[in-house]
Amino acid sequence: MRVKIHCKKFDTEFKMALYAMTEFAMARLVESKRLRNNLSIDVHFRHHSAEGEAMIDHDTNPYRPRHFRVVIDHHRLEEDNYGRKRDVTEWAHEVLKTLAHELVHVKQYVMGELSMRREGLCYRGVHYDVKTLTEYFELPYEIEAYG
């Protein structure tokens, strides 16, 4: 598996933790070593519209994706839901937790459980029409990702 971390101003120890987390999570989620060895995951840390997003890379086959981009907005994770600033340890924990959540979505893409179709995302062949944030958190693929 090829993992590339794109970030600025992260110390080496934290970058190593990100690599280790990615390797560990994917080893647990995707049992087939042959399949894991053919995966490519680019993790980008930058401003984004959500805390995190896992997506199929635009150059890969959408029916059997093997190349993925994970975008994490580490700036959004600096404060909790109540507006309090997190210390460095809490922030690092939230970043790793968000990375793990997005890697579950990568696993869902790899195993064919989650797929991108014309009408949007389909989970196990069913398209879910989401209108509210509450409905979004009740989606089966989000429930699995949140554990």
PLM features: what roles do these ranges have?
Residues 49-93, 106-110:
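Active-site scaffold of zinc-dependent metalloenzymes
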Residues 93-94, 109-142:
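Post-HEXXH active-site segment of zinc metalloproteases
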Residues 97-110, 145:
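Active-site recognition of the HExxH zinc-binding catalytic motif
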Residues 1-8:
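Acidic/histidine-rich, surface-exposed loop or edge segments in extracytoplasmic proteins
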Residues 12, 16, 89-94, 98, ...:
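Soluble non-cytosolic domains of exported or imported proteins
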Residues 3, 78-83, 126-132:
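A short small-residue
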Residues 17-21, 137, 141-144:
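Soluble or luminal CAZymes and related metallo-dependent hydrolases
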Residues 8-69:
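Auxiliary, metal-adjacent structural segments of Zn-dependent hydrolase domains
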